[in-house]
Amino acid sequence: MKNIRNFSIIAHIDHGKSTIADCFIQFCGGLSDREMSSQVLDSMDIEKERGITIKSQSVTLDYHAKNGETYQLNFIDTPGHVDFSYEVSRSLSACEGALLIVDASQGVEAQTVANCYTALEQGLQVVSVLNKIDLPAADPERVMDEIEDVIGVEAHDVVHASAKLGIGIEDILEQIVERIPTPKGNINAPIKALIIDSWFDSYLGVVSLIRMIDGEIKIKTKIKIFSNGGEYIVDEVGIFTPKRKRIDSLKAGEVGFLIANIKNIDGAPVGDTITSAENPASESLEGFRPVQPCVFAGIFPISGKDYEKFRDALAKLRLNDAALQYEPENSDVLGFGFRIGFLGLLHMEIVQERLEREYDLDLIITAPTVIYEILDTKGIIHRVDSLSKMPTNQSISKFREPIITAKILVISKYVGAVMNLCIEKRGIQKNIIYMSRQVSLIYELPLNEVVLDFFDRLKSVSRGFASMDYHFERYQESDLICLDVMINQEPVDALALIMHRDDSVRKGNELVEKMKELIPRQMFDVTIQACIGSKIISRSNVKALRKNVTAKCYGGDVSRKKKLLDKQNKGKKRMRSVGRVDIPKEVFLAILHIN
């Protein structure tokens, strides 16, 4: 065990984490030059295209160090985005050390800080690396100061590297061997292993990536999952090199995979503990919690014929994504679809993109909402994620909304613009810390103001120089209302929104004007109204198309023309009472872009 090193990589999106991982694999001979491709560990197409890591991955490499010994390096590649922070915390708890990679030109970003603090809280040894030192814009001195100021980690022994050119890779590996401690654990104690990640394989069932804490798991060992009590017999254990390689057993301190004929992903939840069914450990590992979605949206197929295909596609995605939760939903306007819960906005985009790309579906997505707490007049608290589940306005006593604490890192030049954005989104400033070049802003913000367009606006007001990390703080009472949209006196359930009363008139007017532009003209007048309960706060009309019925009347008595116009008006009135307005897809997309 003294020659095992377990470590994770902490880095912001696009700071070169997956490229450094590729260099490690090449340097240690995990794959031949012919088998190498860029971003080896990012298995999904969408991961490679967006340049992000979504699922945790692991590789076991043998490194021949300068001191003549051979070390087993177990390296766990983790996601870098705030939506996947639970996966990051579980991956970190499986390690004794972490590699902090910072782009030498961009400097420290908020997500890196959050993950680094998680690592330090868990007692991990942090090894700092400055990547991309070959870039003309690289400023190693400034970034080293930032690492010390913002994160509080010693930066005098930072390794300078360029993964693209292969500079400094051996120095990083030597630092890992020297500075990261050996794993603790007892091979003779009852089995205890942490599930770092699980995914579904259509031939093997659920494959779990595990870190052995105590004991030894062999083929035919009978194991038990702590949280749900499920018992299984192990069919196969092994390691990734990064190819799947079978071995005889996994011992305390090692990281590898386990296959035990588990049929669905809920059978092996991320962060759970595995023990022996015959001789179980007395208690589970700390920190396990079921994954809770915090953003909800309705997704509907454009063609009703695609509903079955959509349902099957969701079931397949769910096999690999335990955080994805869904239930059927029916909308008068959009037909049958599903209400889906996501970890955050990036997670929502990725799920939508995978459904459209991998399963060839055309989908409409409604405005995302969060979970509200509603206290009714009888004192009962309802947790509501959809307007269709709302109690009536008369029975609502109090509205509570989720509040988050956001940490925003921005260069000093754009502080004013970012503060104005936070104020516009009903943010309350809690702290502001000036550092050498960056400023750290701590704000409390309502989550429903963040889910629509906050990230896009933050990037645009800061010219891309701001980054943000957030965590849930509490529920807080707020003056929220339900804004309904009616077309020809018919409420359109899919367009209803929950918002703060102060914003309702402005947003109602914007919504109605936008819809007036987008709804095509009909043979009758179309009335668009925004209302709160029975109070109309905004109204507009889409004028009817009309045929010139008097064109064939030349001269003669005016009563003939009046008779024809009256007949036309009666026809329009009858048409309006029976006619339906088809709302184009663009209207729903426009709602998402209303500020």
Curated annotation (Swiss-Prot):
Residues binding GTP, per UniProt: D14, H15, G16, K17, S18, T19, N131, K132, I133, D134
Keywords linked to the UniProt accession: Cell inner membrane, Cell membrane, GTP-binding, Hydrolase, Membrane, Nucleotide-binding, Protein biosynthesis
Its EC number(s): 3.6.5.n1
Membrane topology label: Peripheral membrane protein
Residue stretches spanning the membrane: none
Gene Ontology CC entries for this record: plasma membrane
Pfam family, one: LepA_C
Subcellular location per the Swiss-Prot or TrEMBL entry: Cell inner membrane
CDD domains documented for this protein: EF4_II, EF4_III, LepA, lepA_C
GO biological process: positive regulation of translation
Molecular functions per Gene Ontology: GTP binding; GTPase activity; guanosine tetraphosphate binding; ribosome binding; translation elongation factor activity
Domain tr-type G: 2-184
Superkingdom of source: Bacteria
Catalytic activity: GTP + H2O = GDP + phosphate + H(+)
Family: Belongs to the TRAFAC class translation factor GTPase superfamily. Classic translation factor GTPase family. LepA subfamily.
Reported function: Required for accurate and efficient protein synthesis under certain stress conditions. May act as a fidelity factor of the translation reaction, by catalyzing a one-codon backward translocation of tRNAs on improperly translocated ribosomes. Back-translocation proceeds from a post-translocation (POST) complex to a pre-translocation (PRE) complex, thus giving elongation factor G a second chance to translocate the tRNAs correctly. Binds to ribosomes in a GTP-dependent manner.
HAMAP family: LepA
Protein name as catalogued: Elongation factor 4
Record organism: Vesicomyosocius okutanii subsp. Calyptogena okutanii (strain HA)
